C-alpha cells in the first residue's frame, strides 16, 4: 500500500495501474456509476480526475490490516498547477491477492471535494451536489 500512495503523490498513474490485478475493482462510493475494472480503466479514471494536479500528498491517519484486507483513513491534499489546494478526508477499503490490488473502494464526501476545486477542474461535473430529501411521514 505504501507503493500505491507514493505513486499517487507523484501522480505516476502507470505505477498505480501496475499495482492492480486484471480484475481489480475501483469504486468511488459517491459515484457508483463511475466504478471501473482493470488497470487500464483505473488509470484512465485517475488521469481524468487528477488532470491539472501537480502532486497529491496523502497523510495516513489510521491503517488496519487483516489478512488480505486493509482499511485506511487518510487526508489527500490536491495541489493544482494553478496554485489552488483542496483537502479531502477519505476512508478506504483495499483488498489484495498476493501483491496485487483486487479492490479499491474510497468513501468521501463529494460536496467537500467539489466545493474546493477550481472551476476549470472537471467542468462537466456540477458543483452543486444534490442532497437526498426525506419523504414526509
Regions found by a protein language model. Give the residues of each.
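Short acidic-aromatic low-complexity motifs
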Residues: 1-22, 134
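Residue-level signal for well-ordered, solvent-exposed loop/turn and beta-edge residues enriched
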Residues: 25, 84, 100-102
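A short, structured loop/turn motif at beta-sheet edges
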Residues: 63-69, 95-102
Amino acid at each position: 500500500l505504501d507503493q500505491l500512495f507514493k505513486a499517487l503523490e507523484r501522480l505516476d498513474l502507470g505505477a498505480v495501474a501496475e499495482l492492480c490485478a486484471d480484475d481489480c475493482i475501483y469504486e468511488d462510493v459517491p459515484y457508483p456509476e463511475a466504478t471501473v475494472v482493470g488497470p487500464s480503466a483505473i488509470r484512465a479514471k485517475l488521469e481524468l480526475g487528477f488532470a491539472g494536479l501537480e502532486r497529491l500528498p496523502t497523510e495516513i491517519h489510521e491503517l488496519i490490516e487483516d489478512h488480505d484486507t486493509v482499511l485506511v483513513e487518510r487526508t489527500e491534499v490536491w495541489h493544482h498547477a494553478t496554485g489552488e489546494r483542496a483537502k479531502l478526508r477519505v476512508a478506504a477499503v483495499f483488498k489484495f491477492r498476493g501483491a496485487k490490488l483486487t479492490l479499491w473502494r474510497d468513501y468521501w464526501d463529494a460536496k467537500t471535494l467539489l466545493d474546493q476545486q477550481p472551476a476549470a477542474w472537471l467542468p462537466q461535473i456540477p458543483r452543486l451536489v444534490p442532497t437526498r430529501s426525506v419523504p414526509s411521514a
